[in-house]
């Protein structure tokens, strides 16, 4: 690891804004590019969100544009202020240290930028960046040999996270809001211990509707016969008295859960691939067919379907074994269900859910009075996390998540890739590992060190 005290004498033009010697011009160019990309990102995002949430006309007339501009200003400021503090730190310190091009410049820039964003969005941004920073630090540790990778580590992390999430889901007031609604959609309300209605009453209503349907005169078609046959199979079979899936036996309950969530996962992955498929509709029509039989479609479907079926099957099995329904069953069922990630391995999903779990447990600790509340914690965590990611983007881009690196390139119109990283190689992080062929054309009138000479510590 590079020593923090070591430095190099180069100026900000030689390392940072190699495309123009003027700090002011470079700042304005970064600002303009970042603003353009920010508007391209947030305008459709907020518009689609407003349509899905069925916002009223008043929102479109008075709130939509200000929210778009506020979020775009936040993202623009994050990129532009990084460039500003990059130059300011060089002028103040007189040289570059290993931490100044990335962490040092990004920390104050991120702190000021996040204050521009709406408070309601800061928490989500903080979770995302904290997740990304943790993943980046892990990769840094692996690259340095200080951390040993664990085979299928993301699956194990997901198993532990799923176990805790399902336990909180089963507990009264364990989860609230979107998280509770999402899990209820995935595993079904049958796994919630308490319901707002009596299960027996619901079962009676179902039976009553079924009888009324059967009393209707008319010729029974083939679909009706098949449906009646399937219902009879699902209805007759083993079901423990503690199980609340009154319309199915335990076996059909698990099978139906798998089919339902497999379909959801398959359709989600198809929808995600639609934009890219339609871009090649006229040039490569055959790619449209691949939209439906792509391998990832079935992988996500198998992941979600097996998660639900394993969770439900384990829960039913434990109810049969112990002859009772217990919230602790959710820990075992959730952990075993987490193995389903073998079908769709994703470090991003595991890390994000683990981060959200830590956040949930932290706020539960605050409510219980066992954990202190830190004001402005989201702002501070966001700033530090973003600074860590920028440090990686400058000094060792190979440890940064590829999707975030592409985002930085888009935000800066590709200028993040034209930094003079060969000069930074002296710090020992392999800064130019993926930029071996790039040599900036610098104007000798504005340089402190003659270009192309070996760099030495001062």
From Swiss-Prot:
InterPro entries linked: Tmem135 (IPR026749), TMEM135_N (IPR031926)
A Gene Ontology cellular-component term: peroxisome
Primary location recorded for the protein, binned into one broad class: mitochondrion
A GO BP entry: unsaturated fatty acid biosynthetic process
Location(s), subcellular: Mitochondrion membrane; Peroxisome membrane
Membrane topology of this protein: Multi-pass membrane protein
Keywords: Membrane, Mitochondrion, Peroxisome, Transmembrane, Transmembrane helix
Chain ranges passing through the membrane: 68-88, 96-116, 149-169, 298-318, 331-351, 380-400
One example GO MF annotation: lipid transporter activity
Signal peptide segment: none
Family: Belongs to the TMEM135 family.
Functional note: Involved in mitochondrial metabolism by regulating the balance between mitochondrial fusion and fission. May act as a regulator of mitochondrial fission that promotes DNM1L-dependent fission through activation of DNM1L. May be involved in peroxisome organization.
Protein name (database record): Transmembrane protein 135
Organism: Homo sapiens (Human)
